[in-house]
Swiss-Prot record:
The modification N-acetylproline is found at P3. The basic functional RuBisCO is composed of a large chain homodimer in a 'head-to-tail' conformation. In form I RuBisCO this homodimer is arranged in a barrel-like tetramer with the small subunits forming a tetrameric 'cap' on each end of the 'barrel'. It catalyses: 2 (2R)-3-phosphoglycerate + 2 H(+) = D-ribulose 1,5-bisphosphate + CO2 + H2O; D-ribulose 1,5-bisphosphate + O2 = 2-phosphoglycolate + (2R)-3-phosphoglycerate + 2 H(+). GO terms for biological process: photorespiration; reductive pentose-phosphate cycle. The gene is rbcL. Keywords: Acetylation, Calvin cycle, Carbon dioxide fixation, Chloroplast, Disulfide bond, Lyase, Magnesium, Metal-binding, Monooxygenase, Oxidoreductase, Photorespiration, Photosynthesis, Plastid. Its main location: plastid. GO terms for molecular function: magnesium ion binding; monooxygenase activity; ribulose-bisphosphate carboxylase activity. It is found in: Plastid, Chloroplast. The record marks K334 as: Transition state stabilizer. It comes from Lolium perenne (Perennial ryegrass). This is Ribulose bisphosphate carboxylase large chain. The keyword Nucleotide-binding does not apply.
Length: 477
């Protein structure tokens, strides 16, 4: 009898409740290349052994429920069940374990991050037998990742579209984020772009509010970037936020952006949802638009160390769903992000093949095959003094985005943009000459100030600004 038709008629149905570990804890299991693998940080309730807790996670996120049901006999649990195949204690914690779970590929709809997350990070996170549960990492098999389009274009295609090579790209979020009229907003974009930036950006919560409707903003921003392009001879872009209350409205905004001829649109992928994001990514590939992704709401999910989901999982999900840029933290700015951990998921966004490296929080070797990469965006509380560190940490394939660090310049937006561009060019030149940006960064910036009054003014304003707080989410030691 085949596994799909196998039943338990020969032994009969036995009603009742039995321990999850009897069915779902299988330490002898050898994982398959086609399995989706998950690493969960599990904190059981007092008295619940780790084997039972890990098995409960495997069961409740796959085929199991709280009691035996007679319809179990109509399928093959051995074919479809999730399996907790390994458990290890968390260093420095008395009642916390990393439980590894393998899921058969057939549990998931092809090309659907929504379906994958509905199972793996669904109701199991409210399970009473667990005090806390966090998804630390996923291994996406090539057999599954190949069912996704992924980023609309990827890093190399974006470089070619923009004709910009050999350095990080520079951006700026327009501030104040809310309250400007469309014409004043467009003017701010123009000044930043003509001053030397590659991109300006809608803030994540700029959609279509009474003070600035989306269509007006799109028109004035398009005018700004075309004027800046004509003056500078460089291709410019503004991330037009297409996020909307419905998918239909979102696509309508993206269509209008394409009709204006702009190079890039934007989406808030967590608040907007993975289904909407994947739809927009498909539209962007079909119509030649780059897609910038903001991660608003991520910290609600990923900041606490014991419960939720690590951002590296959200980053992998975004690469599958589709986006050409995504905000990734700065390491040195105002937002959460430990250096090694941040670089770990930056590699997961950009590289084709990433080896397991627990020191950087990477639990599994990940092979993306031919899926395009995503450019990480460093944004949040950064200014010209951070430029050497950002250039050294993120490398060329990144966007360094200075909002207040551009618009807060004492002489205005265009001088603020010029200061950032001069600082970046100085750091790239110094790096290419073999200088150590980590050690000589301040010296490099001071030297550049001698021939850039805009940079000198920026350095004076932000010379004492630091954000020195310990990150909440750190690597286990």
């Amino acid at each position: 009898m085949s596994p799909q038709t196998e039943t338990k008629a020969s032994v009969g149905f036995q009603a009742g409740v039995k321990d999850y570990k009897l069915t779902y804890y299988t330490p002898e299991y050898e994982t398959k290349d086609t399995d989706i693998l998950a690493a969960f940080r599990v904190t059981p309730q007092p008295g619940v052994p780790p084997e039972e807790a890990g098995a409960a996670v495997a069961a409740e996120s796959s085929t199991g429920t709280w009691t035996t049901v007679w319809t179990d006999g109509l399928t093959s649990l051995d074919r479809y069940k999730g399996r907790c195949y390994h458990i290890e204690p968390v260093a420095g914690e008395d009642n916390q374990w990393i439980c590894y779970v393998a899921y058969p590929l057939d549990l998931f709809e092809e090309g659907s991050v929504t379906n994958m997350f509905t199972s793996i990070v669904g109701n199991v996170f409210g399970f009473k037998a667990l005090r806390a549960l966090r998804l630390e990492d996923l291994r996406i098999p090539v057999a599954y990742s190949k069912t996704f389009q992924g980023p609309p274009h990827g890093i190399q295609v974006e470089r070619d579209k923009l004709n910009k090579y050999g350095r990080p790209l520079l951006g700026c979020t327009i501030k104040p984020k809310l309250g400007l009229s469309a014409k004043n907003y467009g003017r701010a974009c123009y000044e930043c772009l003509r001053g030397g930036l590659d991109f300006t950006k809608d803030d994540e919560n700029v959609n279509s509010q009474p003070f600035m409707r989306w269509r007006d903003r799109f028109v004035f921003c398009a005018e700004a970037l075309y004027k800046a392009q004509a003056e500078t001879g460089e291709i410019k872009g503004h991330y037009l936020n297409a996020t909307a209350g419905t998918c239909e409205e979102m696509i309508k905004r993206a269509v209008f952006a394409r009709e204006l001829g702009v190079p890039i649109v934007m989406h808030d992928y967590i608040t907007g949802g993975f289904t909407a994001n994947t739809s927009l990514a498909h539209y962007c590939r079909d119509n030649g638009l780059l897609l910038h992704i903001h991660r608003a709401m991520h910290a609600v999910i990923d900041r606490q160390k014991n419960h939720g989901m690590h951002f590296r999982v959200l980053a992998k999900a975004l690469r599958m769903s589709g986006g050409d840029h995504i905000h990734s933290g700065t390491v040195v700015g105002k937002l959460e992000g430990e250096r090694e951990m941040t670089l770990g998921f930056v590699d997961l966004l950009r590289d084709d093949f990433i080896e397991k490296d627990r020191a950087r929080g990477i639990f599994f070797t990940q092979d993306w095959a031919s899926m395009p990469g995503v450019i990480p965006v460093a944004s949040g509380g950064i200014h010209v003094w951070h430029m050497p560190a950002l250039t050294e940490i993120f490398g060329d394939d990144s966007v360094l985005q200075f909002g207040g660090g551009t618009l807060g310049h004492p002489w205005g937006n265009a001088p603020g943009a010029a200061a950032n561009r001069v600082a970046l060019e100085a750091c790239v030149q110094a790096r290419n000459e073999g200088r150590d940006l980590a050690r000589e960064g301040n010296e490099i910036i001071r030297a550049a100030c001698k021939w850039s009054p805009e940079l000198a003014a920026a350095c004076e304003v932000w010379k004492a600004i630091k954000f020195e707080f310990e990150p909440v989410d750190t690597i286990d030691n």
